[in-house]
Regions:
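Conserved N-terminal entry element of GNAT/NAT acetyltransferase domains
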Residues: 1-20, 160, 166
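Short hydrophobic/aromatic beta-strand or adjacent loop that forms the aromatic wall/cage
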Residues: 56, 155-161
Length: 166
């Protein structure tokens, strides 16, 4: 899965995350999701991340010189895959890393027999919808928002389900 590229002339590789990556992953994810001020607390914690990594896989983009700059979660759910928690270090957003990780996640899910992939986008993050549409996703439904995090009082939020055939 290693595939070098460059970012600020530093070679990158995409690989599966390991338990040793969890501290750096926590920092990366919580930094990338800090824009979600409509929710209390951080995006994830070590226990949740450990549980996710037992259930599915996290892909990371890592500078060969060291340091994680992006990640995405994948999970096989029968004939469909799920992708979530796409995080890009704020200093590297807009550099193509999101697309690169989405493609890696899609390749992985396809190799596991998935014919489609689903994602969920919080309704408060409408700026993400055009990004996922450019990646080929279409809106297919809504789900109730549920998380250990608490919404800011007075804020409404639900999950927009988007899907893509692989």
């Amino acid at each position: 899965m290693d595939s070098p590229t460059s970012l600020d002339s530093s070679p990158l590789r995409v690989r599966l995350a390991t338990a040793d990556d969890r501290p750096a992953l926590l920092s990366l994810i919580n930094s990338a999701f800090s824009i979600e001020t409509f929710l209390d607390g951080t995006r994830t914690d070590d226990a949740q991340l450990a549980g996710m990594m037992e259930k599915g896989n996290m892909f990371v983009a890592e500078k060969v010189s060291g340091g994680l700059v992006a990640s995405v979660y994948t999970e096989v759910r029968g004939a469909r895959g799920y992708m979530g928690m796409l995080a890009v270090d704020p200093a590297h957003q807009g550099s193509g890393l999101a697309r690169r990780l989405v493609l890696a996640a899609e390749d992985y899910l396809r190799s596991r027999g998935c014919g489609a992939v689903d994602i969920t986008v919080l309704s408060q993050r409408t700026e993400l919808l055009p990004l996922y549409r450019r990646f080929g996703f279409v809106e297919t439904g809504r789900e109730e928002f549920s998380t250990p995090r608490t919404l800011t009082p007075g804020v409404e939020c639900y999950c927009i389900v988007m899907s893509k055939e692989l």
